[in-house]
Amino acid sequence: MTDNRVENSSGRAARKLRLALMGPAFIAAIGYIDPGNFATNIQAGASFGYQLLWVVVWANLMAMLIQILSAKLGIATGKNLAEQIRDHYPRPVVWFYWVQAEIIAMATDLAEFIGAAIGFKLILGVSLLQGAVLTGIATFLILMLQRRGQKPLEKVIGGLLLFVAAAYIVELFFSQPDMAQLGKGMVIPALPNPEAVFLAAGVLGATIMPHVIYLHSSLTQHLHGGTRQQRYSATKWDVAIAMTIAGFVNLAMMATAAAAFHFSGHTGIADLDQAYLTLEPLLSHAAATVFGLSLVAAGLSSTVVGTLAGQVVMQGFVRFHIPLWVRRSITMLPSFIVILMGLDPTRILVMSQVLLSFGIALALVPLLIFTSNATLMGELVNTRRVKQIGWIIVVLVVALNIWLLVGTVMGLS
């Protein structure tokens, strides 16, 4: 009887710790449903129906492992990835890392900020510039929560992630996909032609976000409660739940595009405005509005996460700190310049993804090296199998991004 009480008590304590430590992965998961993912998934679904859903499944599993490694580094060492690079690499290398990480954070933010502005434009009927002003105001308001600590921000961003997931449950209801074909697309790999291979690479290549790798390790480095092993165990639950939700959203995006566009002959849908305008007559005004709202929620939350990540890389690499509102003001400027110059926002989205591809290997390689170092990690060091899987992911993601980069540059030129 006493043993049962002890077991129940320890089980309750473990659940309580899991709940207390839940949140960092929800912030990280937002990076996986940003407007860049909207554009890629919609294009893939419209062009190839359910045939590329399996790519989303595998991309999400890879991303899950990478986020677990990032979170584990923070828990095991009490330092984030940028700080570890600063401590272990020569100063010129550290400065190079900082500059490229800042450029990538700004390129990512450009895509996310413009994505949210497009969302406001679509649902409110305002101009893209007015949408950008609304995006700026909304992100400042969300960032103000940081003054009250990490938890309120985690709750708001987690809420926005759940809102986007709920929006796509509604979209699935409206579009009524063929569940048998959907299931087949998730399980059976298919690449019907070279364009499908390129789009599949786009889905996979755009999934892993370097700025989120830096950020996640900083969100877990100051976690308290329980032993390191217990915190790591709780964090695995956090990552599993948050990334499963993000994975569902990506699957639902592609499945909705397949059901609504591909099977009605609209296979050429390539941008967010086009998707919104085509959804309305095909499904309903409500379906188009829900799409617009989900784009705003994803854009706002991901641009906030991008601002936080930029702060982490600056403090981690060069120990320099500027107020978040100053950083937000500076990183908004490229978006306003792009809009005022009248440049094509979808083209800018694509080009920002190209810039992003440069930083993936630079974040992944040191992450794997540090988490495989027994002196640094102690009992949380990577197992041999995790190391092997990790390096396979690195090689695959880097190869795909190089291929994507070459293909995109040739396509843009």
UniProtKB/Swiss-Prot annotation:
One of the record's GO molecular function terms: symporter activity
Highest taxon listed in the record's lineage: Bacteria
Keyword Phosphoprotein among UniProt keywords: no
GO BP term (any one): iron ion transmembrane transport
Keywords from the UniProt entry: Cell inner membrane, Cell membrane, Ion transport, Membrane, Symport, Transmembrane, Transmembrane helix, Transport
Primary location group: membrane
Cellular localisation: Cell inner membrane
PANTHER family: NATURAL RESISTANCE-ASSOCIATED MACROPHAGE PROTEIN 2, SOLUTE CARRIER PROTEIN FAMILY 11 MEMBER
Similarity remark: Belongs to the NRAMP family.
Protein's name in the database: Divalent metal cation transporter MntH
Organism the protein comes from: Salmonella enteritidis PT4 (strain P125109)
Lineage: Bacteria, Pseudomonadati, Pseudomonadota, Gammaproteobacteria, Enterobacterales
Gene of this entry: mntH
